[in-house]
Amino acid sequence: CSFERIYFSRGSDVDIYKERKRLGEKLVPKILKAINNDIDHTVFSFIPNTAEVAFYGMLQGLDDYLNEEKVQQIAALGHNPNMEELEVILSRRIRSEKVAIKDIKLRTFIAEGNSRNDLAAHVYDITYGSLVPGVDNLVIIDDSIVRGTTLKQSIIGILDRLGPKKIVIVSSSPQVRYPDYYGIDMAKMSEFIAFRAAIELLKERDMKDVIAAAYRKSKDQVGLPKEQMVNYVKDIYAPFTDEEISAKMVELLTPKGTKAKVEIVYQPLEGLHEACPNHLGDWYFSGNYPTPGGVKMVNQAFINYIAVSYTHLRAH
């Protein structure tokens, strides 16, 4: 199970340490795109504490990229380079800071419901003076973005206080789109920010018929043996790219009054598989459950979601 390795397993295990580092490294091309390759005006950081190892992997990948740039710049100087020009090139560094500080006495996932929201605002603080306001981008890596509660209630707001030109939030795992039924407490569809974003996109683009069709097909197979059931929740995501869903998440999670431009970058599924080649269990990201029971449960979770959110569909 890959999510367990990203989030729950002990980071002291050598294989898990290497996998988490690779997850950070795999994100470098997407991060560079998000900041228009402007390394000189970007500060890199992480959400403490579980994302720290992926952060080191990301820094390693960025160092490799910067070294390639330096080689090309030095080569362009010719056979008799000017010392000052060389010094300018060699002085370029990846700028990393500990921007967010976590109060270790508090943990958002301990609290349930409304108390979780109250907690979220008090878990993090920031280091002032860690970037140049209005000039620098801020790239901050987290291990996963599941509900988005802490981002909305706390993190984006406090990072914005530093005055970055752009905030890029990077998830070392892919978009969590489906519930887990094998020991991790993630059972309701409405909890997932990826699912909420896809539903919003369907509404916006006048594609509510996709929701109705997925519901009808899910309802029609309730009496079937679980081995014959299909995960029709995939139809909710099918019309959109990962980037479209991420962009809608930004709209849903960015608090009013945020001055910086915000972007969310997720690990692609292929990046996850390359980083964790021996642990391909990815059902919360892909919807490919390892047992028929998982398909039956996600089917029911979607029906339950419609029952609460779309009373007019329930009658069909």
Give the role of each language-model region.
Residues C1-N36, G113-D118:
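Active-site-facing substrate-recognition patch
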Residues R20, K26-I35, D40-L59, E69-K70, ...:
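Phosphate-binding active sites in nucleotide-utilizing proteins
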Residues T50-F55, D103-T108, V146-T149, P174-D180, ...:
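Flexible loop/turn segments at secondary-structure boundaries
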Residues A51-M58, N137-I158:
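Extended, hydrophobic alpha-helical segments in both membrane/secreted and soluble proteins
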Residues Q60-N137, R177-S190:
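Short, glycine/charge-rich flexible loops or terminal/linker lids adjacent to PRPP-binding catalytic cores
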Residues R95, N137, K165-V168, E263:
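Residues at the starts of beta-strands that form the adenosine-phosphate
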Residues R177-Y305:
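Acidic, metal-coordinating catalytic segment for phosphate/diphosphate chemistry
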Residues T311-H316:
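Conserved small/polar residues in nucleotide/adenosyl-binding loops
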